A protein has these predicted regions:
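Conserved C-terminal active-site "lid" loop/helix of NAD(P)H-dependent oxidoreductases
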Residues: 223-224, 260-262, 267-285, 300-304
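Conserved catalytic Lys-bearing alpha helix of Rossmann-like short-chain dehydrogenase/reductases
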Residues: 86-92, 101, 153-161, 244
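NAD(P)H-binding glycine-rich loop region in Rossmannoid oxidoreductase-like domains
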Residues: 39, 47-87
Length: 304
């Protein structure tokens, strides 16, 4: 079988690291990276996705595109998401149509469903919420409820991808992945976000006379309620790098989908997102479950 030629936009962020760590160098793929800045270790087509003419040559000869490039700040305002997330996504679709690239994996986000979490947290993070007989779970047919302009821009992205899959000829296979809590290798575990908060507190130097409110800087002590709530959230929402890479591989191997939505989340017992649809359609079988961890990496994990 010949290699698949795969273009990755925005490959050097948290989600992209899963590709670099778990897929780059695999004999099945020949990757091209498109990013607005260069990287010392990887050959990169340097261009801003808001500039169609600059990105267009990178799409020639590709079999698939993994579109990760975006303004990923969940708190971004409207002006912050228009060019990278709306214009940029349209440009990627236009370039795929013009270069006749058949397959797109679109990096959507759990923030498309963010108000569900806002309305139900922190109880949502319990394995037995709302009861031991009726687990709260969102699937691909649940109505989007974004929690900000970033999430709304991803709703737009999902819908314009659907339009192109149905109307424009290429791409004619689109996988919208609502990605949940992928982290860099250093924090690729359910305690990662909580430990980052501890580190932020350790790094902060309190100036003379300063009244420092840790909560305003996203920092906390390891034995605090904030730490535990962050652990609870990640035990529900964590997506390990290897599970995310596996889901990408499932999409790249599939030839049945015209357009569909899947949740990129590990097999966490407390997850509030469905993975059964991805299992049934794509053969996704996550290897990780956050409930197996009862401490950060220097602690213990049930399967180690």
């Amino acid at each position: 079988m010949s290699k698949q030629h795969v273009l990755v936009t925005g490959p050097y962020g948290e989600a992209g690291e899963a590709i670099l760590t778990h897929m780059y160098g695999d004999d099945d793929y020949d990757f091209t990276f498109l990013n607005r800045s260069d990287h010392p270790e990887y050959e990169t087509h340097v261009a801003d996705i808001a500039d169609y003419e600059a990105i267009r040559p990178a799409f020639d000869g590709q079999d698939a595109v993994i579109h990760l490039a975006a303004q990923s700040d969940a708190g971004a305002g409207l002006e912050g998401v228009i060019e990278p997330n709306i214009v940029g996504t349209y440009n990627v679709l236009r370039a795929m149509r013009d270069a006749d690239v058949p397959t797109l994996i679109f990096a959507s986000s759990q923030r498309v469903m963010g108000l569900y979490e806002e309305d139900h947290a922190p109880d949502l993070y319990r394995e037995d919420y709302p009861s031991e007989f009726d687990r709260f779970r969102l699937d691909h047919e649940s109505r989007p409820k974004p929690d900000g302009y970033y999430g709304a821009s991803k709703v737009f992205g999902e819908h314009i991808c659907r339009v192109h899959a149905r109307r424009e000829g290429a791409p004619h296979r689109v996988y919208s992945l609502r990605i949940s809590s992928v982290r860099t290798s250093e924090y690729d575990h359910p305690y990662g976000d909580a430990e980052r908060g501890v580190e932020r507190g350790d790094e902060h130097t309190v100036a003379e006379g300063e009244v420092w409110d840790q909560s305003q800087t996203g920092s906390w002590e390891r034995d605090s309620d904030e730490y535990q709530e962050m652990v609870d959230r990640m035990k529900a929402s964590w997506t390990s790098q290897r599970d995310f890479a596996h889901l990408l591989e499932c999409c790249l191997a599939d030839d049945t989908v015209t357009y569909d939505v899947f949740y990129a989340v590990s097999g966490n017992a407390a997850r509030w997102f469905d993975i059964e649809h991805a299992q049934a359609v794509l053969g996704y079988e996550p290897m990780d479950d956050a409930s197996e961890w009862d401490g950060p990496p220097n602690g213990t994990r049930d399967d180690v």
